[in-house]
């Protein structure tokens, strides 16, 4: 017969063991849901990650990210020949530093192009391009091969890595096609417009199918227009009227407002087009009235065929 003292010891050990097991189970469950919440990966994947890493959340997170990246690249390789005719333009402007970018990200379907995860990716790509592209010129156009090598945000991976990861998550082929970057001097003014962008932007970015950036100077203060509003109107005109070039200022401007000026509806030079915001007035006359000089502009359309692609 066991003594009462011996039975008491066994009982105490069993209670302690049960209590410790319960605590471990609660901790394990807590870690599982914590990992699920912070990473967004499936519950079964999170459970596998914790089992492989002895319950260490940090190591499990690292393992999950590595697995997701590998699966993303594998998926990207499988779908790389699928056409990506849908997508979005995303505009990110940093007014404090007088710079902005428009990035085009393509996907297979309009359904994914409107997905919040896709738009979130687009906005982070635009921020990465503007912050991490080491450009010195006022205007630079980058293609896919240059873009995928850039650092993604402040993380230890590239834009190419992040796009591949998103391909794995969303299940469609994607491609960061091009980006235009404006980094202007202090005396220059930056204007921008994105057609179709909602008032509630995501991550301070604007999305749409048509976008424009314009670089201009004002020789004196304007009582009618604030620089930002003027830049927006000029960029909006560029999106709507599709100019192909700036054109040259004429040597002489009309001396009176009574002079009749013929405006060609098919004009492709920006300066000689009818200004969208002021009918029967050429852009150059509007600029002259408001002491404005346009230095440069760019207009992008999502999915448009560009010259370099036509020659392929």
What are these regions (language model features)?
Residues 2, 19-312:
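N-terminal assembly/interaction segments in proteins that build large macromolecular machines
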Residues 1-15:
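N-terminal chloroplast transit peptides
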């Amino acid at each position: 017969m066991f003594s009462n003292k011996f039975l008491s010891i066994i009982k105490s050990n069993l209670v302690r063991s049960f209590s410790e097991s319960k605590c471990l189970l609660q901790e394990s469950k807590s870690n599982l849901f914590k990992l699920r919440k912070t990473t967004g990966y499936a519950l079964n994947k999170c459970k596998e990650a914790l089992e492989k890493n002895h319950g260490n959340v940090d190591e499990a997170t690292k393992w999950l990210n590595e697995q997701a990246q590998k699966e993303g690249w594998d998926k990207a390789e499988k779908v790389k020949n699928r056409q990506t005719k849908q997508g979005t333009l995303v505009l990110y402007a940093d007014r404090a530093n007088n710079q902005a970018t428009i990035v085009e990200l393509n996907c297979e379907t309009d359904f994914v192009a409107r997905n919040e995860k896709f738009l979130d990716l687009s906005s982070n790509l635009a921020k990465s391009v503007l912050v991490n592209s080491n450009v010195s010129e006022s205007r630079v156009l980058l293609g896919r091969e240059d873009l995928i090598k850039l650092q993604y945000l402040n993380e230890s991976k590239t834009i190419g890595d992040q796009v591949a990861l998103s391909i794995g998550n969303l299940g469609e082929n994607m491609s960061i096609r091009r980006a235009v970057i404006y980094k202007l001097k202090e005396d220059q003014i930056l204007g921008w417009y994105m057609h179709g962008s909602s008032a509630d932007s995501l991550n301070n970015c604007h999305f749409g199918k048509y976008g424009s950036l314009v670089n201009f100077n004002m020789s004196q203060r304007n009582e009618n227009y604030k620089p930002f509003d003027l830049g927006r109107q000029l960029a909006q005109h560029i999106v709507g009227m599709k100019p192909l070039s700036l054109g040259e200022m004429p040597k002489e401007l009309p001396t009176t407002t009574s002079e009749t000026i013929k405006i060609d509806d098919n004009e492709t030079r920006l300066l000689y087009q009818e200004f969208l915001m002021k009918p029967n007035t050429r852009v150059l006359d509007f600029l002259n009235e408001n002491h404005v000089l346009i230095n440069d502009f760019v207009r992008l359309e999502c999915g448009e065929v560009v010259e370099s692609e036509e020659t392929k």
